[in-house]
Amino acid sequence: MSKNISTTPPVSCTLCPRRCGADRAAGQTGFCGAGGTLKAARAALHFWEEPCISGTRGSGTVFFSGCTLKCCFCQNYPISAEGLGKEITIEHLAGIFLGLQEQGAHNINLVTPGQWRPWIIAALDIARAEGLRLPIVCNTGGYETVESVEAWRGYIDIWLADLKYVSSSLSAELSSAPDYFAQARPAIEAMMAQAGHPVFDSEGILQKGVILRHLALPGHIDDSFAVLDQMAAWNEADPGCFIPSVMSQYTPFYKAAEHGIGRRITTYEYRRVVNHAMDLGLTAGYMQQKSSAREEYTPSFDLTGV
C-alpha cells in the first residue's frame, strides 16, 4: 500500500504531540533529537519481547535514534537521549528489513519510529515491492497523536504500546510530558480500532492486534492502579480488544536516581500491581517475573546490523 509519502524533512515538524515546529529540512533537531537524515542504532533478531512477538526465531528489531519522550529512567538512553546511531538511507533501511526476513524473523519490530515515520513508510514500500511479507510491529511509548496512528494505517499490523502513566504530574516529572495520558488514551483507542482484536498464526505468533504494556515503577503503584483501571475499562467495553502485559523489569538507568526512583520495584509492590490486574479481570495476557529486572536484557547499541 503506497501513499506516496514524501521523505523531504519537515520544515515545521508536527510528527508527535509536541508539535515542536523544528525545521528539520534546515538541519534543526526537534525535541526528539531527530534531524533531517534517518538514523538507527541497531537491527537484529531480538528474543526478549512478549512470547507471541519473539517466538522461537526472534523479532526483527530495528532501534531508531531519538525519542519524543524524555524518560529519566530509559534503558535505551544512549539512543533515545544521547543521539547514538548511524545515518542511513531509506534504501538501506529497506535492505535491513529484507535481511531480517531472510534471517527468519517472525516480524519487523520498529522501536520508537514515530519521529521517522515518513522515511520508514518509504522504506517499507521499497521492501514490500522486493518481497517483504512479515507483520510490522510499531513499538511505541504510547505518546502519539491520533493523526499519527492513522498515518500508519496499511503499514502497521501490530501495536506494541506502553501506557506509562495516568498522572500528569508524574508524567511531567519522569518523562517531560504533562499531557502524556491526554495524548496516549485517544491514540491507543485509535490503535485498537485500527488493528482489531488479536489474531495469531498456527505457531501462536501474533499477526495483528494490540499489546498494551505497563511498566510498574517503584514508589508509584497508585498510578499503576490507575493505568490498570483504564485498561480494564477498555476491556470491559470490548472484551479481548488488546493483550495486557504488566512488566516488572524496571531498572534504575540513566537519571532515575535524580527523580526519586533509583531502586528496583519490590516484590511486595509488584505483587500488589499484579493482584490489582487480576482483580480487574486482566488475565488474558502477560505478567512478567521479577527476575526480568536485569541489565542483561538491554541490548548493546553497537550499531549491529545498520
Please state what every model-predicted region is.
Residues 1-29, 197-306:
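Auxiliary Fe-S-binding modules of radical SAM enzymes
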Residues 72-76, 82-87, 120-123, 148-149:
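Short, conserved acidic/polar surface loops in the N-terminal third of protein domains
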Residues 78-107, 276:
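Conserved alpha-helical substructure of the radical SAM core
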Residues 1-68, 72, 76-81, 301-303:
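N-terminal [4Fe-4S]-dependent radical SAM core
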Residues 89, 115-116, 292-293:
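Positions that flank functional sites
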Residues 86-90, 177, 181, 263-267:
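Flexible, glycine- and charge-enriched loops at secondary-structure boundaries
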Residues 95-259:
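Conserved AdoMet/S-adenosylmethionine-binding subsite of the radical SAM
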Residues 40-61, 95-113, 285-287:
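Short Fe-S-cluster ligation motifs
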